[in-house]
Amino acid sequence: MKKYILIPLLILSNFVLGQDSITYKYNVDLTGSMNNANNNQQNNIVFSTFNSVNWKKFETGMSTNYQLMTTNKNILINDFTLRVQPRIIDKNYSVFTFGQLSQLTSKKINQRIETGVGGGITTFRTKYLENTLSYGVLYYDNTYVDPTIINSGVRHSPRAQFFGEMKNYKLKYFVECLYQPKVGETSDYILMTKSWVKFDLNKLLGIKLQYTTAYESFFATGATNDIKNFLVGLNYSLN
């Protein structure tokens, strides 16, 4: 049954595509870094996409994220995530549901399935800065390389976002913090942050500087549970 979790979300996507007066958004990021110290070389590349279809107050978004990190040609991270998120958006609130499928070799997880619901509000909006707060609840199931490890259940998922832009300087910025403690077991949690600054070169291309962190308190022996990335690259955006 697990493989059918995303089917209702894809059906909703097709419904939206069949309506009139729809708009599209397409966003691609290609960022990376290279380091060399005492002949020890580390390469890190992240490729992510976001596509959305909007009709009236309905939006269906699909995002992907792939990261490959190597040290002296040895693979440390080789992770991929696919997320589908339909939502209803108004000026000061949103209601959403989502399904997410991941393969996380860095964490020795063959497959992670997540599905949940939630809502968010806009707490303030100024010329240069906006803040949104959201809360969701999700069910997750991890399938580890080691089949003796079992970790599934329900997590809280509060999130805070700050973002804005300075149009005169062609500058956009974004900060996000996500905390996901397991229900009934707060020692098992996930903490992620993301912050970036983008300078638009033209209507389609921009230069992006990004810093992300991802920490998981529950992890398999030998897994990479604390990941930090500082990345520089290009952004392509079509609205």
Where are these regions (language model features)?
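Outer-membrane beta-barrel "beta-signal"
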Residues: 226-239
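Short glycine/proline- and aromatic-enriched beta-strand/turn motifs that initiate or cap beta-hairpins
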Residues: 19-61
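Transmembrane beta-barrel strands of outer-membrane/channel proteins
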Residues: 28-34, 62-66, 84, 97-101, ...
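Detector for outer-membrane/organellar transmembrane beta-barrel domains
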Residues: 130-181
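Repeated loop/turn-to-beta-strand initiation elements of outer-membrane beta-barrel proteins
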Residues: 55-62, 92-96, 127-131, 165-173, ...
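Solvent-exposed loop/turn segments connecting transmembrane beta-strands
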Residues: 35-44, 70-77, 103-111, 145-147, ...
